[in-house]
Curated annotation (Swiss-Prot):
Keywords: Cytoplasm, Metal-binding, NAD, Oxidoreductase, Zinc
Annotated positions binding Zn(2+) 2: 106, 109, 112, 120
Organism: Arabidopsis thaliana
Source species, domain of life: Eukaryota
Subunit description: Homodimer.
Subcellular location: Cytoplasm
Family: Belongs to the zinc-containing alcohol dehydrogenase family. Class-III subfamily.
Class of this enzyme: oxidoreductase
Protein residues bound to NAD(+): 55, 210-215, 234, 239, 304-306, 331, 381
Protein name: Alcohol dehydrogenase-like 1
Free-text remark on how the cofactor is bound: Binds 2 Zn(2+) ions per subunit.
Amino acid sequence: MDKTFFSSNEGKPITCKAAICRKAGEALVIEDIHVDPPQAYEVRIKILCTSLCHTDLTFWKLSFGPISRFPRILGHEAVGVVESIGENVDGFKQGDVVLPVFHPYCEECKDCKSSKTNWCDRYAEDFISNTRRYGMASRFKDSSGEVIHHFLFVSSFSEYTVVDIAHLVKISPEIPVDKAALLSCGVSTGIGAAWKVANVEEGSTIAIFGLGAVGLAVAEGARLRGAAKIIGIDTNSDKFELGKKFGFTDFINPTLCGEKKISEVIKEMTEGGVDYSFECVGLASLLNEAFISTRTGTGKTVMLGMEKHAAPISLGSFDLLRGRVICGSLFGGLKSKLDIPILVDHYLKKELNLDSFITHELNFKEINKAFALLEEGKSLRCILWMDK
């Protein structure tokens, strides 16, 4: 990026294009917006490319509750370049290639300093505010001066955005930016669940419920750890061929199992159950099947899917008593600033398959087409280029 552009805009609002969601479920509108300069502990970044995640789809449709606010700028998977920095910003400078990440890592609280969790006790409970340290204060306004709300502290469906340093990761400029964007949410979530949460070991058996991008990323993580059998469960058999690229060895379509439960089929395939199961859909009923599909005494189930209705989970107490374990996984147990550069390094060493996640590439102006592709199940990850 031209250095004169940096100097001419530093400390001033920037006018740029953004895709604004003005009402739940309605088509996004490309409009001119004003992006304020970063405040203390904030960075303004130029988005190079962004991608769609099912979470964007969920919040696009959400028409009730405190986190349903419009107009807003969605988007949270992206890669960008630092355009300017606010006060008290260490570790970032103009021109750095960065990933914005929805999950905070403040580096200072008890949990961030702990090796046991990736939770941030200081910030992670708040999903409602526009800006991390300034509450409902927004850095976005439309051309008429109306405030535009942020989304998950990222808002990447804009040519420029402002992100708190707790949500920002500096990465190597050697990785292609479209591949890098995938690591800011879904792919990292899946790989991290296999590596950090489950700690899959060589020779283990795996069952993955739901073969979207997160489920496929779990398989990629398990493959790299040397899992012997990776079973994919999905009602869409078309995903099975793609799944082989990520290490799946077997597939189950629940609609073709007759009267047998999925857990029964898995136990027959694995002589009593898998070592690890991963629920990547977000259904309480499916979580129970994932739990029962693991081995008695040692089986571990990891929940990655978000149950949007917060339905209660029903598990047999006797199954728990006999040693099965269940746990949740938010952002794959990863501490963003520490672990994402490691994933970048694995890609640069040609060990990590990121290329196969990208099924479509479009110009940013075609963002509504990208939403339609994802909603119809035709897209795994669609890269939206800002300048192509």
